[in-house]
């Protein structure tokens, strides 16, 4: 709403600095509150030697369009009414009217650098549902979808037109061509957005309105059409496409991960969505690379297209810090290693390959030597034969060396040599 009035020059500064930002304002007519809003702009100017002041008011929902926010809504069972309540809880006294089935959102929703109004407008546009406001009350009251508001008032038909472009654009809504015929009406009666009336046996709904006070007389201009033809074209989160958001792993299951996004820290929403984890290699038969991150690991969530539900976790971002006085696992870029929280590790370095599992391990040097060690035991077993072939073979035991087959035939070396068998031949 804009209000223009004549002002005295000496009052301009007092008015300009004396008005508080978002100061409430209202318009009454015939004992009825026609408009309630907040002051969002003030301008003083001269026209034909007359000094004028213009005040601009917007409905209270302008508070929802002031701050850019980033957060995720991971609970796919949340209903549309639950989403509205979650958003509107930041605005005391805010109310809403949901005029479409209260279904579960059924997908991941991400609000990324959007105001609450921009976000809700985008979400409901996916259902072809417009977002509107009720002007005739103080505070915030929004319409999600087109409500049923019956009524009748005096009017005069001013114009009739149809947009062929809208007929084609909104074909997916299921409305017919006649639903996109606009009726322009003039009236002295103030009606709200989505108000309805009967015209030639059909119900028309206000989709656009304009009021103007001229010489003490209020002129109202309305554009109405069939409710079935009032919709919002889907808006997609193009600002999300190609970005990667930081987070940390909470839980791992199969090839899926549950994460907490850093941007959700101020909001505390439930982290219940399972994201697919993109491995280095995967095929339909299950072959490829399976190495999942661990709880607590830092990760990035990538959004490859305009559909937030297609998001996937692409990699882990290391926050490793070298231990003081210890060996830095990332100290030498020439050494590539793979390890897990259980202590197993494989390293590929300039000198060879090293594999360890805490108290046992294997080393293959570039020099040609292979070392196998274990603090408990080392077992070499084959269904067929085990062959040792070398220029020299040395077998050492701290207390004894024993070679025995399952029949009990063999040799034992302690401080003495003991040979056992059904028959022992010594030449």
Protein language model regions, located:
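Extended, domain-scale alpha-helical bundle/helix-rich regions
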Residues: 47-48, 78, 82-97, 101-228
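Short, charged beta-turn/beta-strand-edge "cap" motif at the junction between a beta-strand
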Residues: 28-33, 90, 200-204, 302-309
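Glycine-rich, acidic and aromatic/proline-enriched surface loops and short helix-turn segments
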Residues: 60, 77-97, 250-272
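Right-handed beta-helix
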Residues: 87, 123, 133, 266-267, ...
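Exposed beta-strand/loop interface patches that mediate assembly or binding
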Residues: 205-212, 216-348
């Amino acid at each position: 709403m804009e209000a223009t009035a004549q002002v005295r020059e000496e009052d301009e500064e007092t008015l300009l600095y004396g008005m508080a930002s978002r100061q409430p304002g209202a318009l009454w007519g015939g004992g009825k509150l026609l408009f309630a809003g907040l002051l969002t702009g003030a301008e003083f100017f001269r026209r034909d030697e007359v000094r004028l002041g213009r005040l601009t008011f917007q409905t209270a929902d302008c508070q929802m369009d002031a701050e850019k926010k980033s957060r995720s809504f991971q609970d796919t069972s949340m209903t549309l009414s639950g989403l509205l309540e979650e958003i509107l809880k930041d605005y005391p006294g805010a109310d809403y009217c949901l005029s479409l089935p209260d279904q579960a959102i059924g997908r991941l929703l991400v609000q990324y650098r959007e105001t609450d109004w921009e976000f809700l407008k985008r979400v409901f546009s996916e259902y072809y549902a417009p977002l509107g406001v009720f002007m005739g009350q103080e505070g915030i009251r929004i319409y999600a979808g087109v409500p049923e508001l019956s009524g009748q008032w005096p009017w005069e038909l001013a114009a009739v037109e149809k947009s062929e472009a809208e007929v084609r654009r909104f074909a997916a809504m299921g409305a017919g061509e006649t639903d996109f015929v606009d009726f322009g009406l003039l009236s002295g009666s103030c009606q709200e957005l989505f108000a309805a009336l009967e015209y030639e046996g059909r119900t028309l709904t206000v989709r656009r309105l304009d009021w103007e006070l001229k010489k003490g007389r209020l002129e109202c201009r309305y554009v109405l059409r069939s409710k079935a033809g009032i919709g919002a074209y889907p808006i997609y989160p193009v600002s999300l496409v190609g970005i990667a958001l930081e987070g940390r792993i909470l839980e791992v299951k199969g090839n899926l991960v549950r994460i907490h996004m850093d941007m959700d820290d101020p909001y505390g929403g439930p982290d219940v969505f399972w994201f697919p984890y993109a491995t280095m290699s995967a095929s339909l038969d299950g072959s490829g690379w399976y190495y999942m991150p661990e709880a607590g690991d830092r990760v990035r969530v990538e959004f490859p297209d305009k559909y937030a539900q297609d998001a996937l976790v692409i990699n882990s971002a290391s926050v490793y810090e070298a231990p003081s006085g210890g060996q830095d696992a990332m100290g030498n870029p020439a050494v590539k290693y793979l390890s897990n929280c259980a202590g197993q590790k494989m390293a590929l370095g300039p000198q060879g390959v090293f594999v360890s599992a805490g108290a046992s391990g294997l080393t293959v040097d570039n020099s040609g030597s292979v070392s196998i060690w274990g603090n408990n035991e080392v077992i070499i077993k084959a269904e067929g034969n085990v062959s040792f072939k070398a220029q020299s073979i040395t077998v050492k035991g701290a207390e004894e060396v024993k070679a025995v087959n399952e029949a009990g035939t063999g040799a034992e070396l302690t401080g003495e040599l003991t040979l056992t068998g059904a028959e022992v031949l010594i030449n």
